[in-house]
Amino acid sequence: MGDMANSSIEFHPKPQQQREVPHVGGFGCTLAELRSLMELRGAEALQKIQEAYGDVSGLCRRLKTSPTEGLADNTNDLEKRRQIYGQNFIPPKQPKTFLQLVWEALQDVTLIILEVAAIVSLGLSFYAPPGEESEACGNVSGGAEDEGEAEAGWIEGAAILLSVICVVLVTAFNDWSKEKQFRGLQSRIEQEQKFTVIRNGQLLQVPVAALVVGDIAQVKYGDLLPADGVLIQGNDLKIDESSLTGESDHVRKSADKDPMLLSGTHVMEGSGRMVVTAVGVNSQTGIIFTLLGAGGEEEEKKDKKGKQQDGAMESSQTKAKKQDGAVAMEMQPLKSAEGGEMEEREKKKANVPKKEKSVLQGKLTKLAVQIGKAGLVMSAITVIILVLYFVIETFVVDGRVWLAECTPVYVQYFVKFFIIGVTVLVVAVPEGLPLAVTISLAYSVKKMMKDNNLVRHLDACETMGNATAICSDKTGTLTTNRMTVVQSYLGDTHYKEIPAPSALTPKILDLLVHAISINSAYTTKILPPEKEGALPRQVGNKTECALLGFILDLKRDFQPVREQIPEDQLYKVYTFNSVRKSMSTVIRMPDGGFRLFSKGASEILLKKCTNILNSNGELRGFRPRDRDDMVKKIIEPMACDGLRTICIAYRDFSAIQEPDWDNENEVVGDLTCIAVVGIEDPVRPEVPEAIRKCQRAGITVRMVTGDNINTARAIAAKCGIIQPGEDFLCLEGKEFNRRIRNEKGEIEQERLDKVWPKLRVLARSSPTDKHTLVKGIIDSTTGEQRQVVAVTGDGTNDGPALKKADVGFAMGIAGTDVAKEASDIILTDDNFTSIVKAVMWGRNVYDSISKFLQFQLTVNVVAVIVAFTGACITQDSPLKAVQMLWVNLIMDTFASLALATEPPTESLLLRKPYGRDKPLISRTMMKNILGHAVYQLTIIFTLLFVGELFFDIDSGRNAPLHSPPSEHYTIIFNTFVMMQLFNEINARKIHGERNVFDGIFSNPIFCTIVLGTFGIQIVIVQFGGKPFSCSPLSTEQWLWCLFVGVGELVWGQVIATIPTSQLKCLKEAGHGPGKDEMTDEELAEGEEEIDHAERELRRGQILWFRGLNRIQTQMEVVSTFKRSGSFQGAVRRRSSVLSQLHDVTNLSTPTHIRVVKAFRSSLYEGLEKPESKSCIHNFMATPEFLINDYTHNIPLIDDTDVDENEERLRAPPPPPPNQNNNAIDSGIYLTTHATKSATSSAFSSRPGSPLHSMETSL
C-alpha cells in the first residue's frame, strides 16, 4: 500500500499498517489509495485491505461510515465527500455548436450544387458582351432584354444563395433542437436510475448521481452496480464482470474471498451490502472512460485524414453492424486504430441475435432511394433536353457559329439550364420526409412519457404500431402487484380467511413468524401508511411483503425477530432465482445445530417435504399420497380462485455433523411443511378493457408466467385473455417443451408452429421458455406476414426475450436494471394499459408519416411534371428555383411539423395491424395523390398556356434571360401554393374519410402553421419582387387563386366518392422488404446501394434514420466500451485477449473483449455527441445489451439464432382440437388457418363463432 500511495501522490507519507493517518477532510484514506485498492482482485485485494485497514470494518471507520447505519444524511458531509472523492458523474463533452451544425448542413450535395450554380450565375450576370457581339450570338431566349433588366441579372443568383442560407439555417436549427430533445430524453432516463442505500439506518432510493464514497449500498439480484465498492456482507452473490474483464463466467463474491465490486457489472444472483469506495471518473469504469477520451483529439484528426483518403467504396465496406439490428440502415463505423476490430465484429455478427430493421424504416429507406433515383433521372433528362434544344435551335436551325466572344453568353444559358435541372431534383426529393419522421417520433416519445412509456429506442415507438402479438407477464402488469395472503393451510386446517392467532398452536405460530421474518430479504418491509386511512406501504419484493403482512395480520411483528438475528449473522442463504423458484436461509441455533427455513412454489417445495406439522404442532409423515391429496383439496382450489400458492417449510440439522452446504439438493430436502398460503394479486380493474381493445385491434395477448397453471388460467379468464367457447391452449413449461421438441430434445419450428397460434397461457415457464416462444413466433412462416411481437419482462434472465422481441417492455418499478437495459420501452407504471397506449401512439406515427407522404408526393409529382414539361416546352420552368426552395424546403418543413403532430384517437385501435408488407402508400392514398395531382396539373397548365388571356395580362412564356417577374408566372406560383395549403387539410385523412376537418382544432400546431404559411406567402408575392421572381397581384387575382385553392377541398370530396376497389390499375408503393424476399447477400447489396444513395442524394433523405439512431450511435460506443477490459487489466490480459479472439468462432458464446487502443477514437467520437453519458451509470439506457454476456447461464434450446433468414418449411395443417388436459374444453372450435393475414381482409365470417383473435378466422 505504501508503494502505491507513494507512486500515486508523492507528498503523502508512507502509512503504517492499520494506523490511521489524517488526510484531507479528516478521512482516513485518500482518493489515490482508494483508486489503487480497486485495481486489485481476489486474495490480493483482501491482503491489501488487511494490511492497510485491518478489515472492511476498518475501511468503513476510515471513511467515517457505519456498516449497518450508513452515512448520516447530512448535506454538508455529503458535499464534502463529493469535493474530496468526486461526484458519481462524468462531465459530457460539449455538444456541437450551432456553427458546427451549420457547417454540417452545408456539406449537402444538392445544396453545394445550388451554391456553385448560383455563384457561376452571379459571376456571369456581371458580364455583358458588346452589342454587336450580342447580335452575333443571337437572341435565342425569344426576346430582347433592356439594359436595366440585364443589370438586374445578378438578383437570381443572389436569391438562390440567400435561399440556400435559409435552408442551411433551418436544417441546422432542426438538428440543434433534435439534439436538445434527445439530451432531454437522456436526462429523463438518468433521473429514472436510482439505487438503494442506507442512510441514518433507513433504506433510501437515491439517484445514482447522488451516491458518494462511504455510502452503504444494498446490492440485489438484477442490479447494475453504479460505483466501485467493497462487499461488507453477501448472500450467494454472483457478478457478471464480462463488461470490464471480458470473463464470461459469473464471479462468486464473498467478504472473505473476493469482496471487490466494480461499477458497470451486473448482479446475476444473490444479494449483499457494500461500502462505496470510488465513484464517477475515479471508478474503474470511469478511469477507462477518461483514458479512452484522453487521446480522442489525436484519433479524431487521424479519422478525418483517414476519411479523406478512404474512397466511398472502402467506407461502405466498413459499416459497423448494429448488434440488435433495430436500426434501419447500418451506420458508419466508429473507426479504430486496429484493423482486426472490423473482422472480429464480422465474425461475431452471425452469433448475435438480430432484430430486423423497423417496419417504417425499411419502407422509408426503399421509398427514399426510389424517389431519389427518379429525381436524378428526371433532372438529368431535363438538362439534356434543354441543352439539345438550345444547341439545335442556335447552331442548326439558325446556322450560327460558336464565337469565342459568345462563350460567356452560352455558358450563361447552360448555367440557367443546370439550375432548372437542379430545381427538378430539389422538387423530386422529399426534403421534408426525414424531418416528418423525426418530428413525429420525437413528438410521440415526448407525449408517451405522459402515458407512462419511457421510450429508449425511437423506432420501437413506431414498431409497436405494427404489433400482432403481446407476450405479457402476469404479476404487476396484468395485476396490481399489491399482494395479500387471503387463504392458508396451517395445522391440518384450511382457512378461507386469516385465522385468529388463538386458533394456532404457539409452536406453529413461532415457526411461521421466524420462517417468514428470517427467510425474506431484510430490505423487504411493511411501513405505516403515509396518509391516514391509506394502506400500509409495501417496500421490496411484493410476495415477501404479502407474507410479512400475514404475520402482522396474525398480531405478531417481524422486526424483533430480525433484530434478534441480524442479516450478517445468517449462516447461509440460497437466494431466489428462476431455476430454483425458492429461497432458503440457514441460521445457527443456540445448541450449535442449524435450522433451514425455505419458501417457494408449493408444487416444487412439497415434493421435498417428508413431514408436516399437525394441529398440535407435532411432526407427521408426509407421503406422496398425502401430497397428492393436498394438491387436489387445497392447492388446486386456491389456484382456481386465482391465488398464488407458496409453501413454507423448515429443517433442523444436528450439531454433530455439519452438512456440505454447497450440496444444495441434499441440504434443501427432507423438509417439514409448516404452511401453504394462498396469495391474492388482484387483476387491475382497467386491464380487461385494455385487452379487449388489443383483440379488437387484431393483437393477440398471451400470458407468460411462472405461476401454477390453474392460477394462470383463472387470472387469464378474469383478464379476458381466454374466453368461454374459444379453442385455445394453456400449457405448462414442461408440456410446452415436450410438444415443440423432437426425440433428440431439439426444437422444431414445424412443431412450434402447431402450438403457438392457439397458445394463450404459458404457465410455470422459465425465461428460456419465454425466449423460445418469442423466437418461434417471430421465425414462423405459417402466415402470410411475419408476426411482430412485443414482450414484457422484469427479471435479469428476461434479457434474451426482451432483446429478441421486436419491442421489449421492461417494468419501471419492479424491473431489474438488466431488464431495463435490454428493453426498448420502460413502463414507468408497470401497467398493461400503457402498452395499449404505446400501440396507439405507434399507429399514429405510421399514420402521421403516411399523411405527410400523401401531401409531399402530391407536391412532388405536380412540381416535377410542371418544371419538366414547362422547361422542355418554354425553355424555362414556370416555377423558379427560389420558389421551389420555398415550396419544397421551407413550406414542406412546416407541413411535416403540422401533419406529424396530429394526436392519436381511439379509432386507431379499431383496425388490424398494417403488417410488415403493407405499403406506406396504400391504394387509397395513391388515388388521393394522383387525383389531386390531376386537378393541380390541369389548373397549372391551363394557367400556363391560356392564363394570360383569362386575366388579360402579358404572357410570361419565352421571356428574355433577365426579364422582370411577370404577373402571369406569379399567378401560377401563387395558385400552386394555395392548392398545396388546402390539400394539406385534405392530407389529414388517408383512409378515405369525408370529414377532413374532424378534430382539426384539437391540433393548434396545424392551424397555426397553415395560417402562418398563408401569411408568409402573401409577403412573398406582394413584396418578394425579383429575388422570388414575383410581381404583386391585385385583389381580384388573389381571390381567383384562393378560389382555385378551395376547389381542392371540393375535389377531395369527389375523389372520396370514387371507390378504391374499382381502381384496379392503381399500384401501391413503399412496400417493406420482406424477410423471406432476400438472401443475406442481397440484403448486403441493398445496404451498399443505400450507402451510395447517402452520398449522392440530399442529406435530408437520410436525416430520418440519422435522427432515429443518434442516441443509438452513442450507446454503441458505450456498449463497445463495456466489452473492453479495464485500462490496467487490458495490459495484463493482452496475450489472453489475442488467444480468445482466435478462438471466438469456436465458442457458443463469444467472449467480448476489446483492447483499449482499439476504441479510443470511437469512444471519443461518441463523447462529442450532446447526448453523451453525463453519468457513467447510464448503462441502463444502453440499447446494445448483448445477450451473449450471460446467455450461457440461460441455455438457449436451439442454435437457430445463427441464421435468421434461413428458409423454413411451411407448417402442415393444424392439429385436431386440443386434447391436452391443461386446455379448457370448448364446444366450439375455431379453425386455425395455415396462412393468416394481419389485416382485416383475412378474416372471413363463419356462423356460430362469436369470438375472434389473430390466430382464429371467423
Swiss-Prot record:
Residues 119-155, 385-417, 870-879, 944-961, 1025-1034 are extracellular. GO terms for molecular function: ATP binding; ATP hydrolysis activity; calcium ion transmembrane transporter activity; calmodulin binding; metal ion binding; P-type calcium transporter activity; P-type calcium transporter activity involved in regulation of presynaptic cytosolic calcium ion concentration; PDZ domain binding. The active site is at D473 (4-aspartylphosphate intermediate). The chain crosses the membrane at residues 98-118, 156-176, 365-384, 418-435, 850-869, 880-900, 921-943, 962-983, 1003-1024, 1035-1056. It is an enzyme of class 7 (translocase). Its main location: membrane. InterPro entries: ATP_Ca_trans_C, ATPase_P-typ_cation-transptr_C, ATPase_P-typ_cation-transptr_N, ATPase_P-typ_cyto_dom_N, ATPase_P-typ_P_site, ATPase_P-typ_TM_dom_sf, ATPase_P-typ_transduc_dom_A_sf, HAD-like_sf. This is Plasma membrane calcium-transporting ATPase 3. It comes from Rattus norvegicus. The lineage of its organism: Eukaryota, Metazoa, Chordata, Craniata, Vertebrata.
